[in-house]
From Swiss-Prot:
It is found in: Cell membrane. NDH-1 is composed of 14 different subunits. Subunits NuoA, H, J, K, L, M, N constitute the membrane sector of the complex. GO terms for cellular component: NADH dehydrogenase complex; plasma membrane. This is NADH-quinone oxidoreductase subunit K. It comes from Rhodococcus erythropolis (strain PR4 / NBRC 100887). The keyword Metal-binding does not apply. The keyword Translocase applies.
């Protein structure tokens, strides 16, 4: 498969993720769309690394996955706290948190 096709797929995945972040109100769906955007960036990093014949993009993608794993832990904990206090995971309810 042509490497440019992977870049097109990466752009498509990133666009779908960005549209989901902007259009959806459910915090879990927004969270999944952010993860989709991170995976699209990882695909682009690995594709560029493959095209240029070095490992820098693959190493950067690995570190991005490590940061994304930490983001999952913190993000889901915050979503659970919002759900316990508001009984909803809507993004609109999250801006009302004070305590």
């Amino acid at each position: 498969m042509n490497p440019e096709n992977y870049l097109y797929l990466s752009v498509l995945l990133f666009t779908i993720g960005a549209a989901g972040v902007l259009l959806r109100r459910n915090a879990i769906v927004v969270f999944m769309c952010i993860e989709l955007m991170l995976n699209a960036a990882n695909l682009a990093f690995v594709t560029f690394a493959r095209m240029h014949g070095n490992l820098d993009g693959q190493i950067f993608a690995f570190f991005t996955m490590v940061v994304a794993a930490a983001e999952v832990v913190v993000g889901l904990a915050i979503i659970m706290i919002i759900f316990r206090s508001r009984r909803s995971v809507s993004v609109d309810d999250a801006d009302l948190l004070k305590y």
